[in-house]
Amino acid sequence: MVRIAGVNVPDRKHAVIALMSIYGIGRSRAKLICLSIGVDEYTKIGQLSDVYIDKMRNEIAKYVVEGDLRREVTLNIKRLIDLGTYRGLRHRRNLPVRGQRTRTNARTRKGPKKLINK
């Protein structure tokens, strides 16, 4: 296993798929990274030389990934809550934030049904 950005990246997978195991790197960004360092996206990580691995590390260092990205997201949500915005209120109440209906559906966000005893 190769360690990139604090994550053990699987070396038996294609470069794009392996890079997607890093939080904050999706398919399109992984393809962009492979293209910029000149690696075929179907090359397995284990077959890459140390030079290309270092190039990959340097390219990924340009982006906000892993712990920094998680911290940034939680701070953004905390800021919304502290400001008292509508979105912050929805986050605090564990309800959908982006205008989805809540009379029916929204079970993932609201959690399991609460039983009402009559």
Swiss-Prot record:
Key words, A-Z: Ribonucleoprotein, Ribosomal protein, RNA-binding, rRNA-binding, tRNA-binding
GO molecular function term, any single one: rRNA binding
Protein name (Swiss-Prot/TrEMBL): Small ribosomal subunit protein uS13
Claim: Disulfide bond is one of the keywords in the record: no
GO terms, biological process: translation
Organism field: Blochmanniella floridana
PANTHER family: 30S RIBOSOMAL PROTEIN S13/40S RIBOSOMAL PROTEIN S18 (PTHR10871), SMALL RIBOSOMAL SUBUNIT PROTEIN US13M (PTHR10871:SF1)
Function: Located at the top of the head of the 30S subunit, it contacts several helices of the 16S rRNA. In the 70S ribosome it contacts the 23S rRNA (bridge B1a) and protein L5 of the 50S subunit (bridge B1b), connecting the 2 subunits; these bridges are implicated in subunit movement. Contacts the tRNAs in the A and P-sites.
Keyword Cytoplasm in record: no
Gene Ontology CC, one term: small ribosomal subunit
Subunit structure: Part of the 30S ribosomal subunit. Forms a loose heterodimer with protein S19. Forms two bridges to the 50S subunit in the 70S ribosome.
Classification lineage: Bacteria, Pseudomonadati, Pseudomonadota, Gammaproteobacteria, Enterobacterales
Family annotation (InterPro entries): Rbsml_uS13_C, Ribosomal_uS13, Ribosomal_uS13-like_H2TH, Ribosomal_uS13_bac-type, Ribosomal_uS13_CS
Matching SUPFAM superfamilies: S13-like H2TH domain
Similarity remark: Belongs to the universal ribosomal protein uS13 family.
Location of the region described as Disordered in the Swiss-Prot/TrEMBL record: 95-118
